[in-house]
Amino acid sequence: MRIIGIDPGLARVGYGIIEIENERKILLDCGVIETGKDKKEEDRLYEIFQDLNELINHWKPTVAAVEKFFFYRSSTTISVVQARGVIMMVLASKKIHVSEYSPAKIKLTIAGSGKASKKDILDAVMYNLDLDKPPKPDDSADALAIALTKLNEDGFN
């Protein structure tokens, strides 16, 4: 099983790809898709579309886990929702099953508390993937936490 975890955003889309091999979780790749603030929004969305397609074509994940988005009173809300729509469209076009998780569910599953801190999440990601140093940037660590939530749900603790 190979999973891609995705932390949606317009400026930065975090991603993390994990493979299960002999009941071990192996980190294959993690990082961010960054879009330039100087570009028009439609160009930024297209960049997410292209880069995510390339990632999926290269790594060929069989399932995906994406953070659910909750509406906040913020000027970036619509942009993030649009980026998330592009992400969901790419995954659907590749026939990849998607599981969605709220931030509280991710924190509870990974760190044992729905109110866990960023450091708690980072420590749990490092522990679960047997990493010596934290994944950078934070968006990629968040994406790995999202992927680990799905794996935990599927019984790969």
Swiss-Prot record:
Q: What is the E.C. number?
A: 3.1.21.10
Residues that hold Mg(2+) 2 according to the record? 67
GO molecular function per UniProt: crossover junction DNA endonuclease activity; DNA binding; magnesium ion binding
Query: Which positions bind Mg(2+) 1?
Result: 7, 139
Broad class of the protein's primary localization: cytoplasm
Catalyzed chemical reaction(s): Endonucleolytic cleavage at a junction such as a reciprocal single-stranded crossover between two homologous DNA duplexes (Holliday junction)
Where is it localised? Cytoplasm
Cofactor binding notes? Binds 2 Mg(2+) ion per subunit.
Kindly give the Pfam families that the UniProt entry links to this protein.
RuvC
Cofactor(s) the record lists: Mg(2+)
Identify the keywords attached in UniProt to this record, alphabetized. Answer: Cytoplasm, DNA damage, DNA recombination, DNA repair, DNA-binding, Endonuclease, Hydrolase, Magnesium, Metal-binding, Nuclease
Q: Which residues form the active site?
A: 7, 67, 139
Q: What class of enzyme is it?
A: hydrolase
Its GO biological process annotations read: DNA recombination; DNA repair
Gene Ontology CC terms, in alphabetical order: cytoplasm; Holliday junction resolvase complex
Give the function comment from the record: The RuvA-RuvB-RuvC complex processes Holliday junction (HJ) DNA during genetic recombination and DNA repair. Endonuclease that resolves HJ intermediates. Cleaves cruciform DNA by making single-stranded nicks across the HJ at symmetrical positions within the homologous arms, yielding a 5'-phosphate and a 3'-hydroxyl group; requires a central core of homology in the junction. The consensus cleavage sequence is 5'-(A/T)TT(C/G)-3'. Cleavage occurs on the 3'-side of the TT dinucleotide at the point of strand exchange.
Complex and partners: Homodimer which binds Holliday junction (HJ) DNA. The HJ becomes 2-fold symmetrical on binding to RuvC with unstacked arms; it has a different conformation from HJ DNA in complex with RuvA. In the full resolvosome a probable DNA-RuvA(4)-RuvB(12)-RuvC(2) complex forms which resolves the HJ.
Record family assignment: Belongs to the RuvC family.
Q: Which HAMAP family does the UniProt record give? A: RuvC (MF_00034)
Protein known as: Crossover junction endodeoxyribonuclease RuvC
Q: Which organism is it from?
A: Prochlorococcus marinus (strain AS9601)
**What's the name of its gene?**
ruvC
